[in-house]
UniProtKB/Swiss-Prot annotation:
One of its GO terms (molecular function) is IMP cyclohydrolase activity. The IMP cyclohydrolase activity resides in the N-terminal region. Its EC number is 2.1.2.3, 3.5.4.10. Keywords: Hydrolase, Multifunctional enzyme, Purine biosynthesis, Transferase. This is Bifunctional purine biosynthesis protein PurH. Belongs to the PurH family. It comes from Psychrobacter arcticus (strain DSM 17307 / VKM B-2377 / 273-4). Pathway: Purine metabolism; IMP biosynthesis via de novo pathway; 5-formamido-1-(5-phospho-D-ribosyl)imidazole-4-carboxamide from 5-amino-1-(5-phospho-D-ribosyl)imidazole-4-carboxamide (10-formyl THF route): step 1/1; Purine metabolism; IMP biosynthesis via de novo pathway; IMP from 5-formamido-1-(5-phospho-D-ribosyl)imidazole-4-carboxamide: step 1/1. It catalyses: (6R)-10-formyltetrahydrofolate + 5-amino-1-(5-phospho-beta-D-ribosyl)imidazole-4-carboxamide = 5-formamido-1-(5-phospho-D-ribosyl)imidazole-4-carboxamide + (6S)-5,6,7,8-tetrahydrofolate; IMP + H2O = 5-formamido-1-(5-phospho-D-ribosyl)imidazole-4-carboxamide. Coiled coil: none annotated. HAMAP family: PurH.
Amino acid sequence: MSKAPLALLSVSDKSNIVEFAQGLIQAGFGLLSTGGTFRLLTEHNVAVTEVSDYTGFPEMMDGRVKTLHPKIHGGILGRRGTDDMVMSEHAIERIDLVVVNLYPFAETIARSDVTMNDAIENIDIGGPTMVRSAAKNHAHVGIVTDPADYTRVLEALGDSTALTATLRYDLAVKAFEHTAQYDGMIANFLGSRVNESQEPESFSRTFNVQLEKVQDLRYGENPHQKAAFYVENNSSKSKQASIATAKQLQGKALSYNNIADTDAALECVKAFSTPACVIVKHANPCGVAVDIDQVAAYRTAFSTDPESSFGGIIAFNRPLTLAAATAIIDNQFVEVIIAPSVEDGVLEATASKKNVRVLVCGDLPAPELRDRQLDYKRVNGGLLVQEQDLGLITAHDLKIVTDVQPTEAQIADLLFSWNVAKYVKSNAIVYAKGQRTIGVGAGQMSRVNSARIAAIKAEHAGLATEGAVMASDAFFPFRDGIDNAAEVGIAAIIQPGGSMRDDETIAAANEHGIAMVFTGMRHFRH
């Protein structure tokens, strides 16, 4: 066995491991390895010793026991200058670098046909033990858990076998983050199957989520609040386009409120399968329009509420065209524009407004294919967790409850306004006509007052409510909302239904000759 310092390599993700191993040998390391990693290295003629040959103890129990041996953990945990004598007495050589990533538990449990046995057999034991041992002894040992760190480790080594204390500490923290994430996934998976049948429940006994800080923010919702932006990194699903995956192409750093509002705008525009534009202010849509012509979609959305759109967030569900980008910056002050991608020339056009932040998020999934993520709401001393509201309604789901039948055009507008209402803070009322918003009433304690505000907004923008449709995110508790709609000329209404007074609201709609449909689905948003 070479007296060169040792590096132990045992990885499930074998990306670039051969090149990394070759670099370690060039830096002066001798290599130990196990199982599949050992076989891969030997196939590429990399000089490496199998761990079982080093320990004199064979792998056993179908690979369950490979590295759990004093010669391995003593070599990792031994304190240089303190434990040298006992290491020498037991022929334990120093292991100065540990390169380990863990069994693919996340990928295993993401399979639709995963069994409990599959999951159990993909719970790594030896790997986390080595990772934690090396991270604990980071004063003397380097630990690498991420293939993305291979290059910087080789660059830091140069022609030596010593990493700086700063780098070892950073890698150790990353290693503990790695094992915490791993154990959290295991606890979530097993904790949601504590019933007799071991069938998955919606929520596990304990809730673990790993978040990674991507940005320190200047301040929070208000200047006296400190803040940072974290993103989830323990999702077993492929990450669909979101504010967390978006890339900023231009403009100054995003603020706390920018991120929150951009999320609201992007999630709303995702609800549309046809080309759409959404303008958001203070997390509420203030203008939404669907149009194959992106410039027309923007101008129409803007015209719903020009005052509120000032300094707003604009989201598109199609690539941002040069014409639309130019129309925006020539027309208004905007904080953020986000789209799946941008066409050539867009950044040159928006560069004239250096404070405009331009983000791309990647292709958006069809509304019916969106991943159902979890929503969190912090309460004092706890966390409310629920499934994301991705409930979809089609024309076939509508229950017509009035004598007057809605026309095909009205049904299209009802479904459009229903999509918008889902993203307006409750109590939410949306007036729409011709696949565009006419007025939005948001966040009122009284539903009828939200309806009044929607009408006021429409009048203020010079938009006619006569013949428009109305969407309500929850049922009308009294007929006053219907009477108010009739006063401004609303022709059709969409609402969940389910009130004790549904008969009264249906009667009111019939009195006024208004078509009304029930969805059977509520969309409170707080």
